[in-house]
Amino acid sequence: MTQKTALAALLLIPSFSFAATVLSAPPELNNKSYVLMDYETGQILASKNENEKLAPASMTKMMTSYIIEQKLLSGELTEDEQVRMNESAWCRGSSSESCMYVPLNGTATALEMLRGIIIQSGNDASKAMAEHIAGNEGTFAHMMNQEAKRIGMTNTSFVNSTGMPAEGHYSTAKDMAMLAQHIIKDSSKYYPIYSEKEFTFNGIKQGNRNALL
C-alpha cells in the first residue's frame, strides 16, 4: 500500500506563514478531498471536501508514528529498545503491501522501526510496534482513537495501525491535517525523519514513499 490516496493532498509548510489572501481561488486538484493548512496558525488556506470521511490508507501510519514518537519522548520507549517481529506482524513479501522486511522472529530497534514506518511505510513495522506497545493491534487501535480524540480529530476512527482496508476505518483531510500539525509541533525531535529520502535495513534500501520529496 502506498501513501497515494484520495483522502488528501496534504501540504503543511512550517517554514512559511502567509495570509489566506495569497490564494485567490482553491487550486484545481484531482484529489477527492484535500486541505492546505498554515502550520503556524492552523488556518485552512484552501480545501475541498475537507470533512468527507474516506479511507486514509497508509496515512494511518501518521498516527502510528506519532504515538511511537510520544512514547520515545516520554521515556516509555527507548530508541535502542529491541522490538521483535512476531508472525502476526511479519511481512511475507506480498506485492499488495509495503514492508520494512524485518525477518520473522528477528528484531530491530524502536528507532529503526520508526524509520521503517515513516520512510518505507512498512506494514510489518507498524504492526510490530503496535504489538510491542499495546500487546496486540486491536488495543493499539484503541490507543490511536483515544489520541485522535485528544487532539480534536472528531471525524476519525482507526481499526488498525497500517491503514489496510477495514470496515469502520476512516478519517478526513481536515483531521489528518490536524494530526500533521501535531507531529510537527509535538515530535520536533523526530520530524526530520519524514524528509529522509531513503532507509536501508537488512541490506534492503528503499526510498521514501512520500512523492513530494
Predicted features along the sequence, with ranges:
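Active-site-adjacent loops and short helices of periplasmic peptidoglycan-processing enzymes
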Residues: A20-K174, Q181-K185
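Hydrophobic h-region of N-terminal signal peptides that target proteins for export
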Residues: L11-A20
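Bacterial N-terminal signal peptides that target proteins for export
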Residues: M1-L7
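Enrichment for repetitive, rod-forming helical segments
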Residues: L10-L11, I68
